[in-house]
Amino acid sequence: MSKKTFEVMLVGSVMALAAQAHAAEPAGTLIGALSSCQKGFFDAVEAKHDALSKIATVQRHAGGTAFIEVTGRAKEDASFVRFSAPYQDADVPLIGYFDEVRDIGTLGKYYSWGFVVQGKVDDIAKQATPRLAEAKRVRAAEGVYVRSDLWRNGHWQDDDQLAGNTAPAPGTVERVLLIEDAGPEFSGAVRIGCSLQGSVTPAMLATERPDI
């Protein structure tokens, strides 16, 4: 075999292996897309529209996005939908979706959205963390896992010191990724979700919550 023939075969083998490796890469997960707490999550819901439509009502929205519908965002007893069957997001079983909007008076608006997952907080956090945006910033605090940002002076800033019991200052917005126990109404389950709280503007909703 000539050197030239061997080199051609070698290049072909490398290209084939690269193609196989690319084909084997897992598709992006919904949890991973959600964790950015931005518009990309709703793009991901659109991309998985057909699969999600089999277990929940999924509405398409202008701009190539989609969202999972709940009966009423502003009503506590209507802001959650349980899937007709679990959705396996890689190795994380999603059993429902929540979408909450609350008016908190002088403190502004509170928006919260995400998934309810079967499992325990520490276990789900361990499974999900490798897929999370800015995973190194996710911290454990009092039984929950959190990553927090603050909108101030016209842009988002990392703020790993945000305290959950302190209201946002006027003119600011907190954006939080939270992994927490889902509460007594969902025994043995965990909430993985995002929230916006404070002086949320229409312009901000357009980039973070285009479904509203």
Indicate residue ranges for each PLM-predicted region.
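Intrinsic disorder/low-complexity segments
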Residues: 17-24, 52, 115, 129, ...
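Short, surface-exposed loop and linker segments with low hydrophobicity and enrichment for Pro/Ser/Thr
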Residues: 20-32, 97-111, 168-198
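Non-cytosolic coordination micro-motifs
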Residues: 130-212
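Short beta-strand element of the conserved SAM-dependent methyltransferase core
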Residues: 68-75, 81, 115-117, 166-167, ...
